Amino acid sequence: MRREFVATKADRYEGIDGLKAYAIIGIALMHVLANGEYGIGGFVFERLIPSFTNLVFLFMMVSGFGMCCGYYQKIIDQKISVEDFYKKRYIKIWPYFALLCALDFVISPSKESLFEVIANLTLCQGLLPNAKISVIGVSWTLAVIFVFYMLFPFFCFLIGNKKRAWRVAVVALVFNWLCANYFKAGRTNIVYDAIYFIVGGLIFLYRKELAEFASKHKVIAGAILLIATVAYFALGGNTLTMLFFCVAALVYTLGCKRGGVLVNPVAKFLGGICFEIYLCHMVIYRVLEKLHLVHLFENGLLAYIFTAVAVICGSVVFSVCAKWFLNKVETFLKERVRRVNHV
């Protein structure tokens, strides 16, 4: 008898919103530091914050896990049609991303930008080889994740059982190494990134056991996460150390059910709009740059703190307002369609 890996409402892992919230704040801090050229020294600004660039891999692993929670069993049991599955992906992503692309084009219009906007609006830009799109440049992560969405039915087949999933993970890890050392394909390539999505799927297959372990043995799970963090900085940010850290972080998160730094109203709120914040934070930075506010203070540290806070707060405000505006537009269009159909 085939074992079912059904994800129910009881499988709601409250800490994941907090994990995503801290990850997006870290990525925003990294981008502000990298683009602002503040000339600040020390471990925090020379190694810690720059390392936050690799938190995108954590997002990929969480995406793999989250998609499995929502759709794995539906795909396996054919309880969702191909049309409904892909419609939901486009409806969730396209309106907000299209709005951002339009704003980016207005801020920096050019023929090249127009071409890139057209590519972005298809959400298929992740299929382009070495696209290096500058319009919403951070959306390369979205491009990779959307290719993952395209391949998700195949992904469900790959992790159809635990034994096969482990074999696929080994192959994906080898492929990751080949991409980096032979094919010269980096993190903007789905094959390079596949290992993170697959490990997210593996964690889904063992989610009940891992959540129980992390819940009962929080100190041990926290210690493993600390060891993974130290290993990352001691051994370097390679695929193995990043996988170790991402797995440790996600497993620790599965055991967080109430209270603490990962489960609280602020973390839940930020985690709920982390996708929007991620896509818009560099647009907010460019606006501040055009207003000559990124170096408002002569002191590099003060200038960085001000800019980072302004970017994060501005991104939150923009995300909330944009979602409100798009919801109003959607409601208006639905009402118009209803009236036309009624007539």
Sequence positions of predicted segments:
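Membrane-cytosol interface segments of multi-pass membrane proteins
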Residues: 1-178, 273-274, 295-343
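Juxtamembrane membrane-interface segments at transmembrane alpha-helix termini
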Residues: 59, 76-77, 129-130, 179-186, ...
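Alpha-helical transmembrane segments of multi-pass integral membrane proteins
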Residues: 106, 226-328
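Membrane-interface helix caps and helix-loop-helix hairpins in membrane proteins
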Residues: 110-112, 131-136, 179-189, 230-239
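Short, aromatic-rich membrane-interface segments at the entry and exit
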Residues: 113-116, 164-168, 186-193, 235-245
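A cytosolic-side transmembrane-helix exit/cap motif
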Residues: 134-141, 189, 212-215, 259-269
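Membrane-interfacial entry segments at the cytosolic side of transmembrane helices
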Residues: 161-168, 212-222, 237, 265, ...
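Hydrophobic transmembrane helix bundles of membrane-integrated enzymes that assemble
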Residues: 166-170, 193-205, 221-225, 248-249, ...
